[in-house]
Amino acid sequence: MVAVEDGYQQLENKLARTPVIGDVHPLLPLALSSSVRIVKCGDDVLSELDDMHAAPQSPTLILQPDSRLAARFPTVSLKSHPPIDAINRNMHCHLEYAREQLLTTYGVTAALTEDVTERRYDIVVLMLVDGLSYGDVIDWIDTVIPCFVDGPSVTYRLADDQKTVLPTVGFPSIVGSPTVFARLHDMGYKNALGYTYWAPDSNVISDFLFKQIPTHRVANFEAILAELRSFTFKQSTYIQIMREGLDGLAHSKREMSRAEIDGAIIAIRQDVERVMQVLSKQKRRVCLYLVADHGILWKTEHDWKVLDVAGSRPRYSTARPDEAACARTVRYERSGQVYYSYTYPYLGSRIKADDSGVHGGLSYQESIVPFAKFEVR
């Protein structure tokens, strides 16, 4: 970590003196100081140079190599994961970069469909994990992609009538409209299966996420594996699985040790491997995509600053906080509802005694989730 910190700080120091062409980790721009401007290509910088005959006035990171600028500005390669504390400190200043240059939850369906169109797998699995951060799985597989939750980092929200699912918040924003299944169905994936652990009182959201998919509520993951073993897939098939992640643990126990959290993360990985092992016996080309709705900030692992906003949840509010607290939020408007998500490490209200973790705000842990891909060829 010392080397990473040094490389990050050296880049910050260099940016204070000159624009830099950066071949960097995709999350590094989120860690840079608020004064740093991030541009995709050198065209804007060139136009400034033409106008001013001098270097740009603000620190500038140029993301794409540019032969026109290479002789004038240094190129820095920094592929290591940036310091998490720097991301949490600065990411609210670089939301434009996150929305335009990172995969977002709104882009998952298109990215998945595009990949399937190119690869033409026989069996496609989408595992939706309720509560898992990019940082939790970073060492699982080299191809895991950081995905930005562009909105309140929650599982779903209902309209005031408590019957209508808001389509641009949480899992609904990931499944998309048209849904993953609707898009794959048009590509020939006529056979579909769905599995969820959610209880019947979650039927509204389950019906939304599993629309037109024959879906089974299961008590545990073993039931999914047992059913998959019983099938012989002779046609192109789409399988959608809702897997409990860390969300349930965050809201069901007063305290969670790091060992318990790590054990739950390992169990998710093992379930991915078990699904792949079962489906590999089909002797077909299989791909499993994994994505989460949000990550978790654990209660005992952070030095919180409590703002005591009336009517607020710990990490977000649907009512506008007072001016002082509002300065510590990012405002989203999704499906006609306004959300004020707190930046790190602020809480609108204290974490419930029975909760060991929270989500809903803007942070590396909550707002950067994994989009991972596992193949059987």
Locations of the language-model features?
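Feature captures the catalytic ectodomains and active-site-proximal regions of enzymes
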Residues: 1-377
